[in-house]
Each structure stands twice: as structure tokens, then as C-alpha cells.
Amino acid sequence: MEQYEFLEQIGKGSFGSALLVRHKHEKKKYVLKKIRLARQTQRTRRSAHQEMELISKMRHPFIVEYKDSWVEKACYVCIVIGYCEGGDMAQAIKKSNGVHFQEEKLCKWLVQLLMGLEYLHSNHILHRDVKCSNIFLTKEQDIRLGDFGLAKILTSDDLTSSVVGTPSYMCPELLADIPYGSKSDIWSLGCCIYEMAYLKPAFKAFDMQALINKINKTIVSPLPAKYSGPFRGLVKSMLRKNPEVRPSASDLLRHPHLQPYVLDVKLRLNNLRRKTLPPELPSSKRIMKKAHFSEPAVTCPAFGERQHRSLWNDRALNPEAEEDTASSIKCISRRISDLSIESSSKGTLICKQVSSSACKVSKYPLAKSSVTSRRIMETGRRSDHLHPVSGGGTTSKIIPSARRTSLPLTKRATNQEVAAYNPIVGILQNVKSPEYSINEPQVDKIAIFPLAPYEQDIFFTPMQRKTSSKSSSVSDRSITKDKCTVQTHTTWQGIQLNMVDNISDGSSSSDQNATAGASSHTTSSSSRRCRFDPSSYRQRADALEGLLEFSARLLQEGRYDELNVLLKPFGPGKVSPRETAIWIAKSLKENRDKTKMVDLNVSREIPHVGLL
């Protein structure tokens, strides 16, 4: 009771009162029905508890809404139900001032009442007190059937014999003390519809005996001529004396005259259900709107409980999607960062990095999407948690990448402020540059590390180096990807690991570092392919051994800056795959062992690129 604020008393009866209250938190009005238990018979107390139990289990759009119930100090049964602003039907008849209701409105009310009774009867519940004062109207003039104080749950034979109810609405079999069933409610409803149409009770007398005689003889005045014959026939069929020929609620709902109203009521109910459903996930048109990724960490609303569609699939399902609000885009950044961490935990190595040059997704039909632009290298078993770009529709060539600063870029990329690159934000940072599509997977200045197999020499011969330098003007080669195969392209990207402070002295260590930088042998003319087996324990052990040996050497020589760069990928909280640093160490180890085989003059021709 503490949750409700008392407003006024709106009704009073022989067993209790009805109070208008307001919920303190919801600010919504309800009706508090207080049924007095003190100084009442055992039957009355049992009926009060039965009403509280029955109404708490009912859920139907045309039955009063149940909110709460309790027993107050063992003196009152309190039932909180929905408030109907339109009052009851008896009040509506009085307010009509002799003006008859339209037949369409009466048919709508009749259909709603029949649906409510059909719900009760299908659950073996008899209302037993259907009358105009127990039929309530909402603000929208819809029906709510209430007051279940005399309701009864039927047994297996679906009949009862107790004489209860309001005499003017009692059926002949009840007055004759004959067991009755659900057809008694149909008789009472017929009396209500007659009263709503005629604006006077169907049966009225000065004494009880005269009333019983009228009911038994079914003596009623004809309905006004303004109502159609089928409607008057419906009311007459509900007032048949023999319950066996009296139609049920289901039979009446199938009557041809009521079919348009039945369909209209059902359509309104379906629309109401759609409005009350939980909101859907944001459409892809709102998710993929134009904006720039400029901040890595933002708080965005949750996508929903299921999240049955990934962000990449949303883009693929809606090729016409364009970017709009920054808040929606920040949600994507947050989501992709989660995917990157999840994928790296499964050992997935992503070997493609887009530079700060802008890229844009061009929209092509399904028939043209034949080349997959993502480049994913799996270490061990495949990760099912990585969300790939859909190959069946318009595909974005921007892939969640996780490169760290331990992977060097070229000078040109450095000049474009790649040093300030944020791995979480940058994956989709510049989605607006033109003329890039799945059919022309083109990447501007990408630093690619070709990983050689264990048995293959990773160094160039002098002839190969000269060929590489001559073909440096060739660019714009296509990118292909086949499991662990990487095909490199664009201009020759020399990557030199500058491990020596003094380069001008021409020491052997400087030559070795220059030669190690040439290990990324990307030739534009031949597009050389390199294969390796990431599941080979022998190769991994050898690479780790080389990493430890080279780290010890740097530590012994006091080259702490280079040691810091080498071991930085192994720090906590990193999302990039550590295999990159392992293979670099393997290259450095083999470089040291094969220094004598490298031509020093060729190594000096390689452009110097500082380690990022």
C-alpha cells in the first residue's frame, strides 16, 4: 500500500469499496478494490480470496488489467487493477440521454466481450455476474470485463448449480435450479447488449415472481428498427431459453455479420503487439554512416542481448549503407577492438596493414566480387571468432589489423604520420578515399614481411638485388591470398634494421644490419611467393633460440635501444601476434651466420630506413 497514493473513492458496494490511487513511481492511475473480510460469512471470504487468485492469473486485452494484490491486516483483500477512464457501461447508457448507440460501436463492443468470455470459458471459468455495471470502458472506448467476485472454476462436467448473480441478468436454467454452464454467461451478455441497444433493461419487474415469469417466457420488447436484421437476430439468439440451442461465444464470433469487426479487432491487437515489442538492433544504415575514427576508446550503447549480426555482415547485407553519426561509428570501433583481442587470443596473425592513405569501399554488384581482399595468416588451427569480410556481397577491403610499432614501415609511410597510428582506431580510420574496390585490391605503401620456409634461404643473391632495384618503378600489383601464402606488390620496400649507432665507420655489424634489412625481398616484377609452416615446432624452436641469442648479444654489447625494440612485442597487453618478432629474430640469426656470403657493395645500395 505504501507504493500507492490515495486520490478518491469512486465506488462502494455491500462487500467493500473502490478507490482511485496513483502509483508513486509509475505515476499511473489504478483502482484499488478493498473487499472487507470482517463480519462476513465464510463463503464471502472464500469468494474474495478466489477473486484475488483468479484475476492474478488472467491475461487478456479485454479483461481488466491486474497489477497487484495482498491481504491487509487480515481484514481486507486488496486488489489493484487497471483504471478505466470511460467508466462502466451503465454510466455510459445514462449519459447517452436516450440517443441510441451506432450499430458499428455495439458490434465492436460485442466482439470484444465475446473474445473475453471465450478466453474465460476456454479456461473453464464462469463469470456468473456479467452485467452493464461490470463492463468498463477505457479512454479509447474499448471494453474491459471486470468484477470476478462470483466467478467459478468449473469441474470436469462444466456445470454448476449455485444460484448467484444479479436477478435481471439471470438465465432461465439458473432460476429453475437446473445445473448450468458457460451458456449462462451468453444469456447475461445478451441482456447487456439488449440494454445497450434499447437503453433499457431486457427484463424488469416490480417483484421477483414477475421477473422470473418474464425471463422464463422470454418476453422482451423488439429492438429499434434502426438496427439491422442480422444484429437483432444475434441478440435474439443469445436470449434463447433452451441453453442447448443458445450459441456459444465461439459460435457467435463466427457469425457472418460480426466477421468484419472480428478482423478489425484482431488487426488492432496485432498493431498494438508490434508497438510493445522491444526495439530492434540499429539498422546498418545508421551504423555505417559517414564519420571519421578519431578516438580509440568510447562508451557506446550495447548492441543487444543476442548480437546475432556482426558489424561486417551488416555492411555486406546493406551495400548502400553510408556513414553518418560519430556515436554510431565509435560503437564500431569499440566492437572491432574486441574482435581483435579475441582473434589474437586464438593465435591469429594478421599480416596486412593499411597506411594512412585514405581508402574507400566502392560498391559493386555480387557478380564482380571475385577477389577477397583480406589477408589473414593463421597460426595453428583456424580461429572461428574472427569476423571475415563477406565475400558474397560488397566487401570492404579494410580489415581489423593489429600491427605494432615493432613492424617497420617505409620512409614514405613515416612521413604520413604513421608513427602516431593507433591500432584500434586506425582499422577503419579513413574510409573515404575514392577508387578502391574488391576488384582492384590496391594498398598504398604497405610494409609486408615475406616469411620464408625453414629450408629456404631468405637472402637475395647479388643478381636478385640488382633485378629488384631495376624494377623499383613498377607498382600497383594485385594482392592474392591463399591460406598461408603472401604475394607482395608495389614498389620495392627495403626494410633495414638499423642496429648500430655509428654507420659511417663501415663496420661488419653495420653491414650485417643492412643485409638483414634486405631480407624483405619484395620484387614487383616476379611477385615472389614465400611459404612457411607455422605449426612446425622445429621452426618455432629455432626462431625462439635465435631471438634469445640475439637478445643476449645486444645486452652484452649494451645496445639497449635496439634490445627494447626487439623485445617490445612481447610486452603485456599487446594485441599484435608475437610470431612477427620471432621470425625477425630468425632472420637476424641467419643473417649473422651468413654474413660472409653477402656482397657488401650491394648492401650499401639499399636505401636506409630507420627502425620505427
UniProtKB/Swiss-Prot annotation:
Alphabetical UniProt keywords: ATP-binding, Kinase, Nucleotide-binding, Serine/threonine-protein kinase, Transferase
Entries under PROSITE patterns matching the protein: PROTEIN_KINASE_ATP (PS00107), PROTEIN_KINASE_DOM (PS50011), PROTEIN_KINASE_ST (PS00108)
Enzyme class: transferase
Biased amino acid composition, Polar residues: 503-513
Single GO molecular function: ATP binding
Active-site residues per Swiss-Prot or TrEMBL entry: D129
Bias kind Low complexity: ranges: 514-527
UniProt EC number: 2.7.11.1
Binding site for ATP: I10, G11, K12, G13, S14, F15, G16, S17, A18, K33
InterPro entries documented for this protein: Kinase-like_dom_sf, NEK_Ser/Thr_kinase, Prot_kinase_dom, Protein_kinase_ATP_BS, Ser/Thr_kinase_AS
Catalytic activity reported: L-seryl-[protein] + ATP = O-phospho-L-seryl-[protein] + ADP + H(+); L-threonyl-[protein] + ATP = O-phospho-L-threonyl-[protein] + ADP + H(+)
Region feature (Disordered): 503-534
Residue stretches making up the Protein kinase domain: 4-258
Pfam families: Pkinase
Role, per record: May be involved in plant development processes.
Family: Belongs to the protein kinase superfamily. NEK Ser/Thr protein kinase family. NIMA subfamily.
The protein, known as: Serine/threonine-protein kinase Nek1
Organism placement in taxonomy: Eukaryota, Viridiplantae, Streptophyta, Embryophyta, Tracheophyta
